[in-house]
Amino acid sequence: MMERSVFLGLDIGSTTAKLALVAADGKLLEAQYLRHGAAVRQTLSTMLDQLALKYPGMAVSAAITGSASLGLSETLGLPFVQEVVAASRAIAVLAPQTDVAVELGGEDAKILYLSQGMDLRMNEACAGGTGAFIDQMAALLHTDASGLNELAANYTTLYPIASRCGVFAKTDVVPLLNEGAAREDLAASIFQAVVEQTIGGLACGNPIRGKVAFLGGPLHFLPELRKRFIATLKLAPEEVVPFPNAQYMVALGTALSLVDLPGAARMADMEPVTLGTLAERAPASDAEDRRPPSLRCSTTKPTTICSANATTGTPPRASRWNPRPARSSSADLGSTTVKAVLADADGAVLTS
């Protein structure tokens, strides 16, 4: 068995991919943060290729987390770590003085209460007040998230803006734009809307006090957003926990969940794997990843509308060695009705 000395944490979220390479003593060796633009597997493959080239032959113990990583966990042969577990592990190791952690991601927001037992608050049904919401509002002002931050630094007035939904927010922002409101004021107001959505929608009256850490990409890269949180919560400078690698925090926690640090439990022993092997396992594109089983029509039982022949991946093209099926079927399972169609090789409907 190879020596356990280096640990890799992967965090594949809804809009970004992060990785953290950590030594046995908890020291961060390498970190990456990339927007994947929905090309999840291609981005991950590129990141792992670059890491394998930089550290040839390096063996690591690895784990993965994130909202877009469940299928990749199986593809890469890596254990899946819950985001909350990874986040709390990173905080416990790197900032144990933290009482409350506020984290914003691409499409989720979390508040972790840590000082009196673990209590997690997380948005459930809407991405309002998250990184995706900020991107959408930035586009409305013809800029990006960084541009929104630069504008907000020079604001003079805050306007009330809805943040539960991007559609509702637009109904507030567009009239203000038409009335001549300054873009700087609108940018700061959008950040304030994110703050109010997070505090009002997640804290639900539970006070955010003590030592507070601000985590996740939006709160790391947008200091004006962080300032709006600090001002709204009336935090003194000594109450804000410094977290220099806040954008990698969950990836760090995923790696640290594998590290055998004093006084902290870790995951069960795993056989290390080389970075090159991980890079080879990663599909170069989404098309190469496994697809759900398809439903195929039985040619031996023509009276049966559909039989579930579980075939993983895209059905092969017709050829002389793999003739086109004589019949094919599809089903539409709606909320109140079920529809099914049986068609021949030319697409003509046989029955429905």
Give the ranges of each region predicted by the language model.
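Phosphate/ATP-binding catalytic cores across multiple sugar-kinase/actin-like superfamilies
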Residues: 189-208, 254, 308-317
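Adenine-nucleotide phosphate-binding core of ATP-dependent small-molecule kinases
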Residues: 169-200
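Glycine-rich phosphate-binding/hydrolytic loop that grips phosphoryl groups
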Residues: 134-136, 243-281
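Glycine-rich phosphate-binding loop plus the immediately following alpha-helix
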Residues: 116-157, 247, 256-260, 352
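Short beta-strand-loop/turn "lid" adjacent to the catalytic site in phosphate-handling enzymes
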Residues: 26, 30-36, 51-85, 112-121
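Glycine-rich phosphate-binding loops at beta-strand->alpha-helix junctions
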Residues: 68-69, 203-232, 243-250
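Short glycine-rich, Thr/Ser-proximal phosphate-binding strand/loop in the N-terminal lobe
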Residues: 4-42, 46-49, 120, 124, ...
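Phosphate/pyrophosphate-binding loops at sites that engage ATP/ADP/AMP, CoA/4′-phosphopantetheine
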Residues: 47-60, 198-210
